[in-house]
């Protein structure tokens, strides 16, 4: 049977309200309705889906679920029209039923935090795959299996697309999924209906305040991952204030592992700590103490923040019953993630690094990491996204001025905002803005930075990372920082 009967998608409260019909697919966009589909109608940020119920019925929708609050449909039809309270928050559960609860048949590892989500998800998938456990990923780089990811519009897809992705990967033999869980997705309840097994918290720093309003609301959104029904295990950064709060709040409900790159042991939980860190010519040697054993691993990855990410990954691998010695070996073999401290061409000088750093904290960590390896000048190319948190712009300027020797400001994704307004917001954070170059054309800025760099210099191109487009006004144009840097070399 292709599809599900309506009764299979409803809970006991709604089942008595209608006759049964076969549902072939779920849609929240009336333009995509095909005969036999279920139309799910609720008020969104831009439009109210309930205004399009008649259009969905004209396209032969088999049934309609609609948000009941402040709405009474005046439509005469034999098609089942079923009211729901808080429908937007229940779409995930409905979609999970439609796809036979795929997350229940796989180990779902949810990762939240301002920075580190993508790296941790990709590293976990690499390591589990290497150990013979077929592992999919869902996140900023797309969903699917490493090497063949499908693009998504959000870090965490909308509920129907999310459950469909789970179902596709289950069909292709996935036994585990490493999944980035954004604060937006948690706040909007996109992950309702997902059975998480392990929740990972990386760290919290300023971002998305245009959406959340303040840091406390942002923190509470991140915490929601640890409140998901059925969750049994958490992995938490003990070096972070919110991490400490999560441990205090949830240590009695969940089995928690705390990790620390600063050697901090929290006696309230099992601890994975870096007891000694030794910089190498490229990367680090790290001694670790864990509940599963003690040992040393080396990594070629740039940045002490990546040590923190690797401790989270080590914790997850051991919780997934990978033997400790094998887990350590996997850490040493992990490959860098596209757009995350990515070396453009390791065979040529100057060294050029592309990184997704688009918050003050991430930019500071990237620059600090590169300073440790820099024998000449550290040159930083960055901008800030338009239509996003304006408050972080001067903060990023202050960070760049403190840690870089030369700064070139440029466009990131200005979107509908004036590029000059964005630059002015950034410049407000500089003590000496006259020392800062401005080149709005990002390709020109990258070319200028590379050509001005001497052999021992390092150029950091920050903000866009893996992205392959640039959004200027209403145009989405092809653009790739790595490719532009290669042209400039």
UniProtKB/Swiss-Prot annotation:
- UniProt keyword Kinase, yes or no: no
- Pathways involved: Cell wall biogenesis; peptidoglycan biosynthesis
Catalytic reaction list: UDP-N-acetyl-alpha-D-muramoyl-L-alanyl-D-glutamate + meso-2,6-diaminopimelate + ATP = UDP-N-acetyl-alpha-D-muramoyl-L-alanyl-gamma-D-glutamyl-meso-2,6-diaminopimelate + ADP + phosphate + H(+)
EC class of the enzyme, as a word: ligase
UniProt keywords, alphabetically:
ATP-binding, Cell cycle, Cell division, Cell shape, Cell wall biogenesis/degradation, Cytoplasm, Ligase, Magnesium, Nucleotide-binding, Peptidoglycan synthesis
Give me the segments passing through the membrane.
Answer: none
Under the heading Gene3D superfamilies, the entry gives:
Mur ligase, C-terminal domain, Mur-like, catalytic domain, MurE/MurF, N-terminal domain
GO-annotated molecular function: ATP binding; magnesium ion binding; UDP-N-acetylmuramoylalanyl-D-glutamate-2,6-diaminopimelate ligase activity
Q: Where does the protein principally reside? A: cytoplasm
N6-carboxylysine: modified positions: 222
Post-translation: what modifications? Carboxylation is probably crucial for Mg(2+) binding and, consequently, for the gamma-phosphate positioning of ATP.
The entry's UDP-N-acetyl-alpha-D-muramoyl-L-alanyl-D-glutamate-binding residues are: 30, 155-156, 182, 188, 190
Question: Could you tell me the Gene Ontology terms of the biological process aspect for this record?
Answer: cell division; cell wall organization; peptidoglycan biosynthetic process; regulation of cell shape
Q: Which InterPro entries match?
A: Mur-like_cat_sf, Mur_ligase_C, Mur_ligase_C_dom_sf, Mur_ligase_cen, Mur_ligase_N, MurE/MurF_N, UDP-N-AcMur-Glu-dNH2Pim_ligase
Give the enzyme's EC designation: 6.3.2.13
Answer yes or no on keyword Cell wall biogenesis/degradation. Answer: yes
Subcellular compartments: Cytoplasm
Tell me the cofactors it needs.
Mg(2+)
Q: Where does meso-2,6-diaminopimelate bind?
A: 388, 412-415, 463, 467
Instruction: Please provide one cellular component term from the Gene Ontology annotations of this protein.
Output: cytoplasm
- Family stated for the protein in its record: Belongs to the MurCDEF family. MurE subfamily.
User: What HAMAP family does this protein's entry cite?
Assistant: MurE
| PANTHER family the record matches | MUR LIGASE FAMILY MEMBER (PTHR23135), UDP-N-ACETYLMURAMOYL-L-ALANYL-D-GLUTAMATE--2,6-DIAMINOPIMELATE LIGASE MURE HOMOLOG, CHLOROPLASTIC (PTHR23135:SF4)
What NCBIfam families does the record tag this protein with?
murE, PRK00139.1-2, PRK00139.1-4
Q: What is this protein called?
A: UDP-N-acetylmuramoyl-L-alanyl-D-glutamate--2,6-diaminopimelate ligase
Give the species: Coxiella burnetii (strain RSA 493 / Nine Mile phase I)
